[in-house]
Amino acid sequence: MKIGNYQLKNNLIVAPMAGVTDRPFRELCLRYGAGMAVSEMMSANPKLWKTSKSKQRMVHEGESGIRSVQIAGSDPQLMADAAQFSVENGAQIIDINMGCPAKKVNKKLAGSALLQYPTIIEEILKAVVNAVDVPVTLKTRTGWDTDNKNCVQIAKLAEDCGIQALALHGRTKACMYKGEAEYDSIKAVKEAISIPVIANGDIDSPEKAKFVLEYTGADALMIGRPAQGRPWIFQEIHHYLENGTTMDELPTQEVKAIMLGHVNALHEFYGEYLGPRIARKHVGWYLKEHEQASEFRRTFNAIDAAPLQIEALEGYFDNVAS
């Protein structure tokens, strides 16, 4: 699949997730089969660009793969400025967030709250597309609530405004992440527009990935929460789509190597104070299927020193192996 002039190595994309899809996680997912990874959203508020968190999000030098950066906001000019700032700092694709259902984002009339206001959406899309010379994509939801699903209208508007690919999550804003994603709306959008459509929502297995692609006719899949603690899910899905067979479960020692590599990368990227704290949630995701890990997770979450975290993980896997 192509977005503008950029050819993805496959049609599996890492969804932007605040506090998750930082550079270490993106690099890991790309290594294990993702065709592209979208960065966590950056606020269009320029007052926040100078914070240490925003500066870290803008570190793209030497990053592998296509650099897609997501921006969020509701003011057309500020969104245009944020897009330009992102491109100046290495973004090759700009993604506009109109899908986040979080109250923190929606109370500022950003994310999926914008779905109530197509006129503002049009102003934002035109402003961003006209502000940069790179492809602009849009991530959104099926509508505001089940009685107000306007994704086909928004998709047509996006195409008319010059958006070059659209990712659609199969839930409304009101649904948050409850219940199950539905794919009829994604199918309807795919039938209504000619730009690439990327299906998103509950794609948590190779079999589900194949079903969603075939049912919706989507050009690509975007995977978010199922990749938390399982970045190799992209490899599993790609193998299944290519060969029709499922891969064997990764050996425990390989999972250990992936996790230790990820935790070390977090320590290096964020430093000795923040790194161990951010590593905690990732380790929790990696071990969520381990029945024997609940007590270990409580112990691990109390460890503040990076070397002690590595030592604890080594010890945990030694115990599992024995």
UniProtKB/Swiss-Prot annotation:
SUPFAM superfamilies linked: FMN-linked oxidoreductases
Listed PROSITE patterns: UPF0034
Entry annotation: catalytic residues: 100
Superkingdom of the source species: Bacteria
Role of this protein: Catalyzes the synthesis of 5,6-dihydrouridine (D), a modified base found in the D-loop of most tRNAs, via the reduction of the C5-C6 double bond in target uridines.
PANTHER family in UniProt: TRNA-DIHYDROURIDINE(47) SYNTHASE [NAD(P)(+)]-LIKE
Protein's recorded name: tRNA-dihydrouridine synthase B
The species this protein was found in: Vibrio parahaemolyticus serotype O3:K6 (strain RIMD 2210633)
Higher taxonomy: Bacteria, Pseudomonadati, Pseudomonadota, Gammaproteobacteria, Vibrionales
Gene (name only): dusB
